[in-house]
């Protein structure tokens, strides 16, 4: 906590502190704490910020986050990779909509950000996603392994994890620590567009959230016709990065040995769905790509 507060007070964290303040200034934080049930897993979630509020914030944040890469021509710079990612995503989103029919109205979108040294991907509330080219190229992903990554990110969105993380941040009084509601409110309104990026992407998921996303993501991929065994092979590749040290973003995932066992168990559980999907016509759902406004 102290380290986070030092970062918030630093120049790099100034905008982020303003964003946290926006939650209070604009009434996104309610006075009475509330809990709800995870729409996918049934787990009880703290929800001071509603899913719709998180979706609204993420929509603006997504545009802001992609703006530098778009300006530099790094969004969907490789048309073949972009088409590959979008095609897989459309199959996965069709299965996501089966989980939660109301998500058919989400503005689903995925882009590939050209960044050869970045092994990462993210999803925001409302189905706004990005995958970095480095994770595809460095790990030499098969379609099934790529489907596991995208399915995992979709699962975070389906499970309202962005809103949950925003709520946990509020409950920890981050928005009230040392920052007064002073200055031009129009500035707060402008920086509020990036709120979803800060709390929806930069704050890490809890291990409970990661475990949920593993399970739901593997099931989505299996239903879409992608071999669930790819989850374990993907994990082995990721864990072998950087001379045996997994990427930093895996730090909140379960321990390697236990996660490997769990992924294998889940693969066995969902294999019948995969076998069924292989002999059927797999549906798709429209997903916007990098050329979308």
Describe the residue ranges of each PLM region.
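A Zn2+-metalloprotease active-site environment signal
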Residues: 2-293
């Amino acid at each position: 906590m102290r380290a986070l507060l030092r970062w918030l007070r630093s120049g790099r964290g100034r905008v982020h502190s303003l964003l946290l303040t926006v939650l209070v200034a604009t009434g996104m934080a309610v006075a009475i704490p509330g809990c709800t049930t995870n729409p996918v897993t049934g787990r009880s979630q703290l929800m001071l910020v509603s899913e719709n509020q998180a979706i609204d914030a993420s929509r603006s944040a997504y545009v802001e986050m992609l703006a530098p890469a778009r300006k530099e021509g790094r969004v969907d710079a490789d048309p073949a990779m972009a088409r590959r990612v979008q095609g897989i995503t459309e199959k996965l989103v069709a299965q996501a909509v089966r989980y939660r029919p109301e998500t058919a109205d989400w503005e689903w979108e995925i882009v590939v950000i050209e960044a050869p040294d970045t092994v990462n991907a993210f999803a925001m509330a409302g189905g706004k996603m990005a995958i970095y080219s480095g994770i595809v190229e460095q790990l030499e992903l098969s379609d099934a392994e790529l489907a596991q990554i995208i399915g995992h990110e979709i699962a975070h969105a389906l499970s309202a994890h962005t809103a949950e993380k925003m709520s946990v941040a509020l409950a920890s009084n981050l928005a009230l620590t040392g920052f007064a509601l002073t200055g031009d409110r129009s500035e707060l309104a402008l920086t509020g567009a990036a709120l979803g990026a800060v709390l929806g992407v930069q704050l890490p998921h809890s291990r409970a959230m990661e475990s949920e996303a593993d399970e739901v993501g593997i099931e989505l991929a299996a239903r879409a016709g992608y071999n669930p065994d790819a989850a374990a092979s993907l994990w082995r590749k990721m864990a072998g990065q950087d001379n045996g040290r997994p990427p930093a973003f895996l730090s909140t995932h379960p321990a390697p040995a236990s996660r490997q066992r769990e992924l294998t168990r889940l693969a066995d559980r969902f294999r019948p769905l995969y076998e069924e999907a292989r002999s059927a016509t797999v549906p798709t759902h429209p997903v916007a790509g990098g050329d979308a406004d």
